[in-house]
Amino acid sequence: MPKYRSATTTHGRNMAGARALWRATGVKEEDFGKPIIAVVNSFTQFVPGHVHLKDLGQLVAREIEAAGGIAKEFNTIAVDDGIAMGHGGMLYSLPSRELIADSVEYMVNAHCADAMVCISNCDKITPGMLMAAMRLNIPAIFVSGGPMEAGKTKLSDQIIKLDLVDAMMQGADPKVSDAQSEQIERSACPTCGSCSGMFTANSMNCLTEALGLSQPGNGSLLATHADRKQLFLTAGQRIVELTKRYYEQDDASVLPRNIANKAAFENAIALDIAMGGSTNTVLHLLAAAQEGEVEFDMTDIDRMSRQVPHLCKVAPSTQKYHMEDVHRAGGVMGILGELQRAGLLKDQTRTVLGISLQEQLAQYDVKQTQDPAVHTMFRAGPAGIRTTQAFSQDCRWDTLDDDRQEGCIRDKAHAFSQDGGLAVLKGNLAIDGCIVKTAGVDESILKFRGPAVVYESQEDAVNGILGGQVKAGDVVVIRYEGPKGGPGMQEMLYPTTYLKSMGLGKQCALLTDGRFSGGTSGLSIGHASPEAANGGTIGLVRSGDSIAIDIPNRSITLEVSESELAARRAEQDKLGWKPVDRQRTVSLALKAYASMATSADKGAVRDKSKLEG
């Protein structure tokens, strides 16, 4: 039977000093021997998705202590990708994921914590904590801050829903008046919470449900709604139960690697494809799988992408639905229920509720259960009141959206498309693959061929797009923006947004070894692997080269002869695979990250071969 890790610091005469320090933190004599549970918070006033988390850690802590544990809270950093976007700050976003994972490991292992509750929300925080949970493999439950309410405003006598991307697009569109742009800006982000569409933050919080590491409702229940408080209370109670089951009953089934196993990762990517989630989730799932030694890679993602239909269409792929609408339709449990009925779910995986996914769906899928409490929970809706306070309203929809033919969530027979929301493309331009969010691609450009317009940085691409260098039919190529080449693998939301604002959103393609915001839509292909800095073919493209993209057949081809490519490669080998004339300051911290970063097909994690002798 495993020994409590915390006993290392709480038992034995030689630990008198450690116990003295524990006492100074408030631990009482009768507490020694109880499990020490880390409350891993990520409160910050920089990020709307985290601004309301300050007191929620102690909410969890009180429940832990009432259930017989010792709760100790600490915070991680949290970068707001939207605020960091469009300037040098975005270089730090993805590397912050590794720092978060490491900082959780450092705190938990340094103090010998027995288990943890992870309070996350936004883009890199949930993935960083997920990587740490898989790495440490101690009992863990995730509970996120929840989604923001969708913005709403009146334009041309019509109420429309808004989000961050609308503010960015309107601000970049020269045809939009200053007054309208300011109106959209003021209305786009009305409350605390992660941005209101199926962007990276909400996608990842949904995926923790599919992985079995969070409770039903975690991904979709609004940050402002009073019902969300129960998720935090239950997390505090439940983590003590899981901890005692492992350490006192030798039940290893409650550990993250046994909950989030290969089948659970396949369920997570099936959910991601079905809901048209952010392409960043691919990066983060690959990274988490590696931390947990789960054999899950791009081959699995490619296979699943050919099987799973697109069942849920949400902003940025449509402005009709946001996360509050997904919740009203049954949330993640509703989507997983449809995958189950389509035979596309492995429902014998376990969850932090201590039951199988099949049993959990029987209780929480609104199409399977008539439990009034569950139906009431999924009717939790927005209040439309600007606030930074969690649990500040208790509004409810009058009815559920359980229309699986024309509603927000569809059954397989009435899917938005039988082809899923994500696809892996391969070819001589991306030998190890690249990712496109097909949910956001117009049917007219699923097959596309055009001349390349090559840029060595995102900044140059933005200037080129706004300067009129890109024409209808072009393929914009932005390279040396991968994990190593950027470094930091910047998000390319501004280039895609500006293509739309210039009227080219359905007339151009964009290819990069960088990545895209969860707010991106259009023919935007990212994660080209190997990246240019690692000798990838994307580093050999020249302006004017023809590029052929075929999403239905999952291919991407640089239409240049092998002999010409060989000559170009020899030239780049001499030049060292570096961007030409790029003006960018790279700090020592970023250089340290770049020195060990793998390409996107490996999750942009550290190259462990450089650490192992």
Swiss-Prot record:
Name under which the protein is recorded: Dihydroxy-acid dehydratase
Pathway as given in its UniProt record: Amino-acid biosynthesis; L-isoleucine biosynthesis; L-isoleucine from 2-oxobutanoate: step 3/4; Amino-acid biosynthesis; L-valine biosynthesis; L-valine from pyruvate: step 3/4
Enzyme class: lyase
Cofactor remark: Binds 1 [2Fe-2S] cluster per subunit. This cluster acts as a Lewis acid cofactor.
Family matches, as InterPro entries: Dihydro-acid_dehy_C (IPR042096), DihydroxyA_deHydtase (IPR004404), DiOHA_6PGluconate_deHydtase_CS (IPR020558), ILV_EDD_C (IPR056740), ILV_EDD_N (IPR000581), IlvD/EDD_N (IPR037237)
Reactions listed under catalytic activity: (2R)-2,3-dihydroxy-3-methylbutanoate = 3-methyl-2-oxobutanoate + H2O; (2R,3R)-2,3-dihydroxy-3-methylpentanoate = (S)-3-methyl-2-oxopentanoate + H2O
Protein residues bound to Mg(2+): D81, D123, K124, E491
Function: Functions in the biosynthesis of branched-chain amino acids. Catalyzes the dehydration of (2R,3R)-2,3-dihydroxy-3-methylpentanoate (2,3-dihydroxy-3-methylvalerate) into 2-oxo-3-methylpentanoate (2-oxo-3-methylvalerate) and of (2R)-2,3-dihydroxy-3-methylbutanoate (2,3-dihydroxyisovalerate) into 2-oxo-3-methylbutanoate (2-oxoisovalerate), the penultimate precursor to L-isoleucine and L-valine, respectively.
E.C. no: 4.2.1.9
Signal peptide stretch: none
Pfam families xrefs: ILV_EDD_C, ILVD_EDD_N
GO molecular function: 2 iron, 2 sulfur cluster binding; dihydroxy-acid dehydratase activity; hydro-lyase activity; magnesium ion binding
Cofactor: [2Fe-2S] cluster; Mg(2+)
Record: active site: S517 (proton acceptor)
Family from the record: Belongs to the IlvD/Edd family.
Swiss-Prot/TrEMBL GO biological process terms: isoleucine biosynthetic process; L-valine biosynthetic process
Residues binding [2Fe-2S] cluster: C122, C195
GO cellular component: cytosol
PROSITE patterns in the cross-refs: ILVD_EDD_1, ILVD_EDD_2
Residues annotated with N6-carboxylysine modification: K124
